[in-house]
Amino acid sequence: MKILFLAILICSSLIFPSSSFASHIELKPCVEIAHCVREEWEVNNIEKPFEKIKTFIENTPRTEIVEIDGDYLHAEATSKWMKYVDDLEVSFLPESNILSIRSESRVGEGDLGVNQKRVDLLKSKMF
């Protein structure tokens, strides 16, 4: 009986990788503050906050969602003139109603405040 239980446990771990059970992906901290912004917001009074921010990102010009995994979203925002690509990540923790946002430029030392403006715009659409 123990062998059967162990076999079932091993098989289920092969069929369902541990990442499929993750409900929250922790966003990396900002290493270079000059071109990265990371914030966490309590979204207690907002119905379906992840869906709301996802819809806004889908409708943002020059921004393309490249990955969605449960309550995690990764998008790429391309600048209008120089075509620089910034990474925008959103992760939602439903148990505590915390929405984590991270926006970072891929190149350069600074971003002329673009990432902070992007995060501020998202926040204004949420609240």
Kindly give the residue locations of the regions a language model identified.
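Ser/Thr-rich, low-complexity intrinsically disordered terminal regions
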Residues: P17-F127
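Bacterial N-terminal signal peptides
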Residues: L6-I15
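Positively charged n-region of N-terminal signal peptides that target proteins for export
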Residues: M1-F5
